[in-house]
Amino acid sequence: MTLESFWEKVTESNLRQGDYLVNCPVPVYSEIPQENSWLEIQIGFSDLIIITQSCDLENGKNDLVALCPIYTLAEFEEENPKASQKGFWEQVRKAKIEGFHLLSPFQNPENNRECLVVDFREIYSLPFEFLTKHAASLENRWRLKPPYLEHFSQAFARFFMRVGLPANIPPFK
């Protein structure tokens, strides 16, 4: 069975959950400001994927849009050497490592070394109008297709709704 792409190309400027926004400007804070003082903020650039629900985006319910960074495996491994250990990505693929979600590459879904990884542990919140203008400037961009979009959304929900217990029921022997 041939694996189809998880993605479709879109040219419209409207935003939806699962939209991949390349080279998006994000604030980078270097220090905590003192009261009544100015703070210089650096601007970084990151590839991001929208996690805000499409219905909220379409109905204008949000002034801010939630996004997570998305990386190629090589980019992620460069910053996180532990990720290059044997078996790491297989555990992520099986949803055994919290906070990460794998998505197929845009062009060659059969090659899992070209996969993309979403890091749910880092969430940005950027203005809706700003992102709409950024999306319009991209001309073509990628958007997750169903049912991969729903799978992605559910993975984020599972990560976000975790509850850590102080103690657990002991294992059965």
Identify the function of each model-found stretch:
Residues V26-S30, C55:
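Short, charged beta-turn/beta-strand-edge "cap" motif at the junction between a beta-strand
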Residues V10, C24-V26:
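A structural micro-motif recognizing beta-strand termini
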Residues E40-E58:
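Short, hydrophobic, well-ordered secondary-structure elements
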